[in-house]
Amino acid sequence: MKFAAIFLVTCVFFSLFSSNLSQGEKLSMDPTRRPWCPSKKQMFGGNCGNDGDSLCLMLLAASWDESLRHSSISCNCTTYPNYKILCSCPNMICP
């Protein structure tokens, strides 16, 4: 019985410790920067105009983690209604 109680307390301790450890890693990052990549797309306000691909790269680079800027990235800009653009960077390398 005593062994079971010690085992249970140890399991709970390690469970709490590991969840706090993973949360602490996220807190060390700048909250305005994204490590990014789930979809490689993001919606912004604006209009693509003649140079939408460069505009998308500039907008996305401003919100990405700096490690992504070292890779060669090309983006596509698609204009949507209500002054919205969809920026897509399919060849982006995720960390």
UniProtKB/Swiss-Prot annotation:
It comes from the Eukaryota. The gene is SCRL6. Disulfide bonds join 37-94, 48-77, 56-87, 75-89. The keyword Translocase does not apply. Keywords: Antimicrobial, Disulfide bond, Fungicide, Plant defense, Secreted, Signal. GO terms for biological process: defense response to fungus; killing of cells of another organism; signal transduction. It is found in: Secreted. PANTHER family: DEFENSIN-LIKE PROTEIN 245-RELATED. Belongs to the DEFL family. Residues 1-24 form the signal peptide. The keyword Glycoprotein does not apply. This is Defensin-like protein 247. GO terms for cellular component: extracellular region.
